[in-house]
A protein has these predicted regions:
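Catalytic core of tubulin tyrosine ligase-like
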Residues: 5-178, 182
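Domain-scale signature associated with acetyltransferase and cell-envelope carbohydrate enzymes
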Residues: 167-210
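Short acidic donor-binding/metal-coordinating loop in glycosyltransferase active sites
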Residues: 1
Length: 210
């Protein structure tokens, strides 16, 4: 609900899971921005694939790096999951664990919030297909009122991505501006051209300042 770049019913994602014979679930994954980014990470738990929520991950693992300096656990969970029907049927009789997180609730800081997450189904199912995506194309979370991961940064990411769609399609755009293409006009940049741009500008294509 807080990801402005999410691809609804992504055909590549659906097709990837459908083409696997033994996998019954899949989840999109991005490289973490840094060790402090508040996203869960993909890891094996008791030899089964799963997600460790950021609030449950010990700091020593959060900061752990490889010899080249990259994060050891950098597969970030962006909460875009997909299940085959047989997987959902298996979960009908299962119960998911509770997680705790400190949040600001009704103006009260450091309140405890108890949550259940769908990703805890992965160890129960036993198989999960990680599907890597590019952050700039698919992950623009809105978690803060301002600063990083805010409405402003999400707006800018949409504008830059759609501007790139138009540029690749040959549209005569203003590179100093940002653009938003209606999903009724193009799902992921297909079907665009300079002719379409000129016809739809101000209608299904909006131009705005950074």
């Amino acid at each position: 609900v807080d990801k402005a770049l999410v691809k609804v019913c992504d055909p590549a994602f659906v097709g990837a899971l459908a083409s696997t014979g033994n996998m019954i679930s899949a989840s999109k994954v991005v490289h973490k921005r840094n060790a402090a980014e508040k996203v869960g990470i993909f890891a094996f738990q008791n030899k089964k694939p799963g997600v460790v929520e950021y609030s449950d991950l010990p700091e020593k693992y959060r900061e752990m790096t490889n010899p080249d300096g990259s994060l050891t656990f950098d597969g970030g969970n962006i909460a875009i999951h997909l299940f085959k029907m047989e997987g959902l049927r298996k979960l009908q009789s299962s119960s998911l664990p509770w997680h705790t997180a400190r949040k600001t609730v009704c103006g009260i800081e450091n309140s405890w919030k108890f949550e259940q997450f769908l990703f805890d189904a992965f160890p129960l199912l036993g198989t999960m297909l990680p599907f890597g995506v590019v952050r700039e194309d698919e992950f623009s979370p809105v978690k803060n009122a301002e600063g990083h991961d805010s409405p402003k940064t999400a707006r800018e990411m949409i504008g830059k991505l759609h501007r790139e769609w138009l540029r690749k399609a040959g549209a005569k755009i203003n590179q100093a501006k940002l653009y938003e293409v209606s999903p009724t006009l193009s799902y992921a940049g297909e079907g665009l051209s300079n002719r379409v741009f000129e016809r739809e500008l101000g209608k299904n294509i909006l131009e705005f300042d950074p």
